[in-house]
C-alpha cells in the first residue's frame, strides 16, 4: 500500500497553484540576511546554539556540527535505542536533493554507535514507493555497507515502515490533534535524532526539522495540511527529538518537496545542528531561503508555543 494517500498529493498540487508563500530558488542563498540572527543572539539567559558546518564532506560537516553543540556523548548514552529520522520520502537520487544525503545519515549512525547505543534504527514513511525511495536515495546501500564493514548488522538497522506498528496516541495539550496514529518505534525510542534535508515546500514554504517529523505519522497526513502549523507543533511536542541535524549539502530551492529537476538544486555544502529544533529551523530558513519566522507559519507557531526558543533573540549561531 502506498504510504501517502492520494488526497495529499492532490492537495499539494492544488496548493502549488494557490499558495502565496514560496522560496525563490532563483535568488540563490540569501546569506546577507543571516547576520540578523547572529546580531540578535542574546548575551545572557538561556541561549540555543545552532552550529553551521561547511566543507566538501557531508560526513565531516555532520560530525563537526554535532561536536560544536556539545558532541554526541552529551546526548546518546550507553545502551540507548536511537532512532535516526532522515527524509526518505521520495524516489530521488542524492543529486536531486529531495532526500537526506546518505553520508550524513551514516555519520550520525557511526557517532551513535561509538557513543554506546545498543541499536540505531533508521526509517521514514515514504510518499513514493518505499523500496524505490530507500534504494534510489542511496540510504539503503549506505546503511547496509556500513553495517557489513563494521559487523554492525545487529546494531544498525534500516526498517521499512509497517502499518501494524502505528498506534493511536493521545496528544495532551494539543492545539489541533488530540489523537493521531504515531509510529511505535519513535514512541519507544530512548533518543531521536531528526535528520531532514533542507528544501523548498510548495505548501509550507520550507521543510526542515519540524516538518520532517510528519514521517512518524500514520493515516491520511494530507488532512493536517489545513492546520499544518498547529499540527506540527502537536506532533513535535508528543515525540520531541532532542537533536536536529539538517542536511544542506544540496538544497532543492523550488518545486519541492519532491523536485526531480537538477536545475532546481543548489550545491551548498553545509550541515546545521542544534539541540533545539525550533532554533535550527529559524536559522536554516533564514540562512538558506532568506525567510524569517513570520514568513513560515509553522516556525512562527512553534516559537509562539514555546516548543523551543520563543524568539530569534534566544539563538546563538556559530560557524564551524
List the predicted regions and their residue ranges:
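N-terminal and secondary-structure boundary signal
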Residues: 2-320
Amino acid at each position: 500500500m502506498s504510504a501517502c494517500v492520494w488526497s495529499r498529493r492532490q492537495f499539494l498540487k492544488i496548493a502549488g497553484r494557490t499558495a502565496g508563500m514560496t522560496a525563490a530558488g532563483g535568488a540563490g542563498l540569501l546569506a546577507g540576511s543571516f547576520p540578523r540572527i547572529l546580531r540578535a543572539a542574546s548575551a545572557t539567559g538561556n541561549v540555543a546554539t545552532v552550529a553551521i558546518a561547511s566543507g566538501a564532506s557531508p560526513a565531516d560537516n555532520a560530525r563537526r556540527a554535532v561536536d560544536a553543540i556539545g558532541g554526541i556523548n552529551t546526548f546518546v548514552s550507553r545502551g540507548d535505542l536511537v532512532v535516526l529520522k532522515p527524509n526518505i520520502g521520495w524516489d530521488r537520487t542524492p543529486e536531486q536533493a529531495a532526500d537526506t544525503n546518505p553520508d550524513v545519515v551514516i555519520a550520525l549512525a557511526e557517532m551513535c554507535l561509538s557513543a554506546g547505543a545498543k541499536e540505531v534504527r533508521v526509517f521514514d514513511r515514504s510518499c513514493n514507493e518505499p523500496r524505490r525511495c530507500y534504494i534510489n536515495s542511496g540510504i539503503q546501500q549506505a546503511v547496509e555497507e556500513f553495517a557489513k564493514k563494521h559487523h554492525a548488522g545487529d546494531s544498525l538497522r534500516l526498517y521499512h515502515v509497517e502499518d501494524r506498528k502505528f498506534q493511536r496516541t493521545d496528544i495532551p495539550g494539543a492545539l489541533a490533534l488530540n489523537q493521531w496514529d504515531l509510529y511505535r518505534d519513535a514512541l519507544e525510542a530512548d533518543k531521536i535524532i531528526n535528520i531532514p534535508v533542507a528544501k523548498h515546500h510548495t505548501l509550507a514554504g520550507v521543510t526542515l526539522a519540524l516538518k520532517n517529523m510528519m514521517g512518524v505519522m500514520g493515516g491520511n497526513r494530507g488532512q493536517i495540511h489545513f492546520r499544518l502549523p498547529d499540527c506540527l507543533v502537536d506532533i513535535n511536542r508528543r515525540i520531541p527529538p532532542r537533536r536536529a541535524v539538517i542536511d544542506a549539502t544540496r538544497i532543492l530551492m523550488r518545486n519541492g518537496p519532491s523536485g526531480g529537476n537538477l536545475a532546481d538544486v543548489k550545491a551548498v555544502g553545509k550541515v546545521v545542528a542544534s539541540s533545539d529544533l525550533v532554533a535550527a529551523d529559524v536559522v536554516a530558513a533564514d540562512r538558506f531561503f532568506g525567510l524569517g519566522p513570520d514568513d513560515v507559519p509553522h516556525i512562527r507557531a512553534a516559537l509562539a508555543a514555546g516548543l523551543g526558543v520563543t524568539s530569534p533573540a534566544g539563538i546563538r549561531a556559530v560557524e564551524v
